[in-house]
């Protein structure tokens, strides 16, 4: 059984810090739905990220990511990305053919390895890692297709700790993903992620420096988790 199912919705608040004070800068959400592609059952996962309109004059963000992943093995079949970040705009569409080991985008067809993820499906892949199989400091390898390239990345397991968020206190699993440098985030192991230490592994908090300042993302609500949120110590 996977850590999530159709109907799951997770809501986040994004806080921005540039002079030592965190301000409510935006919101994000992830939703999971059932659908079919060529009669194959898939999870249609949508990730939305928006800056608050009052801060759009500083850096406007209107991002939408979609992935369609096979319900049997969590391999992505299709990936869509619409990005508006400051003056940067990008639309991307990728179709994965795992039988032929290819990924076809608007720019061409590329060879891919057998186990490949897109930038959104990789989040749900990571949620299904059994971290009890790893020691603190271990690297968990992953392969991602992004911007028409295959990237060998990893997650570094950092152990377990209690994390206090705007939504409550939780027993959490901490890891650091190796990021690919983009318009907002720097590359490397600068981001820290805490997920619930229970069967859901939902993201509870994300902290990372960005091009200017830093961001903190807190989980603020959810619907239809697959399992009880047993990691919660106190809070809502």
Residue ranges and their predicted role:
Residues 1-96, 134-236:
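Acidic, serine/threonine-rich low-complexity disordered tracts
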Residues 88-131:
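Hydrophobic, well-structured mid-protein blocks that either form specific transmembrane helices
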